[in-house]
């Protein structure tokens, strides 16, 4: 009972850190995504969206424009879009086929954590919390001079991203670099980050509250937002990214 009360008070004290609304997305203060290319990408033709899905595309475009995720473009770059079914939610995910752009992008070799290293770091911990950033990639802006390279084409026009979309080959490296830099003083001590999955781990209840407070403080200072409905607190068993379980 005391544990629940302590957690409730902690969450209330960081109320502004949490949101479920895209129009309240945070914007990382210390990093922006760059796209360095060697040449213009090959041009792929615009894909025809099935008639039954056109309203889905139209609504997604309107939502992203309204929330400043994208803007109209006059770019010479133009990658086609595609819709991918979300198995768990029964919805469609709006994606851009960035293969032409990725083929001419200079690769960022920043390392992604090894799963075994994550498992080894959790040894001895008894309490776990998993934190989910609301549309984490979108909380990192694109460098202004590189936004035109993210342009995509569809029946409703040509647009480019203001923030980092899925599908860019270097997006995982940029995001991992941001997380590792943000948590550099506590990484592997009581925080693990695998791309957009944040794990806080501790040996005692009191220690876990203290660790969560430190993490919340760092996220707040960096102007990032968590999605409360996707966060889990004080678990004794968690699913580690890429299907591994730990308890």
Spans of model-derived segments:
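Reverse-transcribing Pol proteins
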Residues: 1-110, 189-195, 200-202, 242
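Generic recognition of stable, solvent-exposed alpha-helical segments in well-folded globular domains
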Residues: 2-9, 26, 52-59, 76, ...
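Reverse-transcriptase-like RNA-dependent polymerase core
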Residues: 16-43, 84-93, 108-110, 120-122, ...
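Residues at helix-coil transition
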Residues: 19, 66, 184, 220-221
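Structured helix-beta-strand junction loops
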Residues: 67, 124-125, 189, 222
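Acidic, metal-ion-coordinating active-site neighborhood of RNase H-like domains
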Residues: 74-106, 131-139, 170, 197-247
